[in-house]
Amino acid sequence: MSIGGVYELAFCRSSLKSKKYFIILLALAAIAGLGTHAAWSSNGLPRIDNKTLARLAQQHPVVVLFRHAERCDRSTNQCLSDKTGITVKGTQDARELGNAFSADIPDFDLYSSNTVRTIQSATWFSAGKKLTVDKRLLQCGNEIYSAIKDLQSKAPDKNIVIFTHNHCLTYIAKNKRDATFKPDYLDGLVMHVEKGKVYLDGEFGNAANLLI
């Protein structure tokens, strides 16, 4: 079976029950260890790097949610500007992540919650790309699923990048996979929408940071 076929089975067949779905993900991990850039996190979530994400995006549009970059008010590093925003180091980290991401996923719509730190993170992640600020992305219960589905319905064939907050990502991982996820700055989750439902595919991580 081709790699693309495995990803199609693992991520696109929403009718699979959770146990069978987990078995398929285990098979995916085994195959990934032989030649793809995928691995498993200690929390049990599949880890997906930008190369694997690009292949996944060929199967269906993806939704990637990132935590914002380093906060100014919780760091001794130099602030970019506003104390409620991010640090200069945070801008550099966001730009580096954005360059690597855009090299493999160049076409996506960009959103952020309505805080200075998420807006700055999104702006530095993708300089020049139109950013849409949506206050619903600050709400981290079931409301965030409604927001994701609404954004995806506006452009069903487009990939989406969202800058949000650690408690949102923690909630999604626990709610969708019963996984304990404590994201660091610029950590992310990969999701997709299928037939009106939102699915969590795994944790996003750069290839250099994955243990294969």
From Swiss-Prot:
Its EC number is 3.1.3.-. Keywords: Hydrolase, Periplasm, Signal. One of its GO terms (cellular component) is periplasmic space. It holds the Pfam family His_Phos_1. Residues 1-32 form the signal peptide. InterPro entries: His_Pase_superF_clade-1, His_PPase_superfam, LipoPS_heptP_Pase. GO terms for biological process: lipopolysaccharide metabolic process. It is found in: Periplasm. GO terms for molecular function: phosphatase activity. The keyword S-adenosyl-L-methionine does not apply. The keyword Signal applies. It comes from the Bacteria. Belongs to the phosphoglycerate mutase family. Ais subfamily. Catalyzes the dephosphorylation of heptose(II) of the outer membrane lipopolysaccharide core. This is Lipopolysaccharide core heptose(II)-phosphate phosphatase. It comes from Shigella boydii serotype 4 (strain Sb227). The gene is ais.
